[in-house]
Regions:
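N-terminal secretory signal peptides that target proteins for export/translocation
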Residues: 1-8
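Bacterial N-terminal signal peptides
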Residues: 11-24
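PEST-like low-complexity, intrinsically disordered acidic/proline/serine-rich tracts
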Residues: 26-325, 332-346, 355-359, 363-370, ...
Length: 409
């Protein structure tokens, strides 16, 4: 199967008004000052994960179930540790083999790692952290588990990025049908769990594609399936293993392992992510029609550069749909970049946006008669800052087909 991606960038400022929400003067949504450390309790004096300070045996509930949260008379919370790149936590395959990427997923992760900053991180838009990402974000925003035996479920509470939670159902239910998961994917997915001795096993599916697996930008598709194993090995330590299975992005499942420390004096405080998110103050606004050719093109207002990643599929009418990745760059003045439908990158030679009906026309390829070319004609949909996509038709030589790509925050 062929894989297609755009290796550099293209972007339109008018679309940015709704669909990119990016800024030049970026302040990370998770930024806090030292007073936040003091306010949260013990000022960061927390046992090192997996360290010698066990703090005693792991507590249990009245029915003997391992207690992942506070004791009845105590307080405290788990503190995420900063594990930037999950490849450093690999246990299967070995670290020497690396994460088993598919080519398009590796290209996207490398782009996010080398060419981007926090301005593309979904968490910078107050988007929830999915899978095991909340445990490895670092910082001073704790996590709590609220066990509700009478309801046969566990609530996982996360202070960052903005009072998120997820339900872990322990009542023996199955996941929703594949059709329902495809129709209503979510940021956190659908989680069911069970106990294997002292280990909580959590099975999660039904993710949308709007999150990163880790802070380094490991991508995933809606096929992502995560198995987490959580074991409180002592009062002060939580051991976590997470297995990621995603045949749309990786060639095989891969597993990481790490530990979190218990902060005995910590608790979740009010943290309103949106109040510290500056993106919406710096939307790029259109002052002229977005028409340009190569580097000479499209003059737009305010001159704010922006980046964005679109993922989706394209393929011939009635044929197999292949993965399409579009990495977009808007330098504040022009739509630039390349279109790469094969091994050779095609520079953008023409870009036209009609802001009245939100259509975008892109042409790429070498100049001259008979040169290989690709043409994309699309229309933007879902014009909100949380969900937006570009759907349309393409022409490549004698081949014609359709495509749909969605902005990945």
């Amino acid at each position: 199967m062929r894989r297609h991606w755009i290796t550099r960038s293209l972007t339109t400022a008018a679309v940015l008004t709704f669909s990119f929400c990016l800024t030049t003067q970026f302040v990370p949504a998770q930024a806090v000052d030292e007073s936040r450390l003091r306010h949260s309790g013990d000022g960061g004096k927390v046992p090192e994960p997996g360290g010698k300070d066990a703090g005693g045996p792991a507590p249990r509930l009245a029915d003997g179930t391992p207690n992942l949260g506070r004791t009845e008379i105590g307080k405290g919370a788990w503190l995420p540790k900063l594990y930037t790149d999950y490849s450093s936590l690999l246990v299967d395959p070995p670290k020497s083999q690396g994460v088993p990427f598919q080519p398009w997923a590796k290209a996207l992760q490398e782009y996010r790692h080398k060419a981007t900053s926090e301005s593309e991180d979904p968490a910078s838009f107050c988007i929830p952290l999915a899978g095991s990402h909340p445990y490895t974000r670092g910082g001073v925003h704790p996590i709590e588990f609220i066990q509700l035996p009478e309801q046969k479920r566990i609530l996982q509470l996360m202070e960052f990025p903005g009072h998120n939670w997820r339900d872990i159902f322990l009542d023996g239910r199955s996941h929703p049908s594949k059709q329902e998961l495809e129709e209503y994917p979510t940021f956190m997915g659908h989680s069911i769990g069970h106990w294997e001795g002292a280990t909580l096993v959590v099975d999660t599916v039904g993710f949308n594609e709007g999150t990163w697996i880790d802070k380094e930008g490991h991508p995933h598709t809606s096929q992502l399936h995560v198995i987490e194993k959580l074991a409180r090995t002592s009062m002060n330590n939580l051991h976590i293993e997470a297995t990621f299975e995603d045949p749309g992005a990786y060639t095989r499942p891969w597993t990481i392992a790490f530990d979190l420390a218990w902060g005995p004096d910590w608790a979740i405080k009010e943290y309103i992510c949106q109040s510290n998110n500056r993106y919406q103050d710096y939307y790029v606004k259109t002052t002229k029609g977005a028409t340009g050719t190569g580097n000479a093109g499209a003059e737009f207002g305010h001159g704010h550069p922006a980046k964005g990643t679109f993922l989706g599929e394209w393929g011939p009418n009635g044929g197999t749909q292949d993965r399409l990745m579009v990495l977009m760059d808007w330098d504040g003045k022009a739509i630039t970049g390349t279109i790469n439908p094969g091994p050779q990158a095609m520079p953008i030679t023409k870009a036209e946006l009609n802001p009245e009906n939100w259509t975008l026309h892109l042409e790429g390829g070498a100049s001259g008669a008979g040169a290989a070319r690709v043409v994309l004609d699309g229309k933007f949909e879902n014009l909100t800052w949380l969900a937006r996509s570009l759907t349309g038709t393409y022409t490549q030589g004698n081949q014609r087909g359709t495509f749909k790509i969605t902005r990945q925050y």
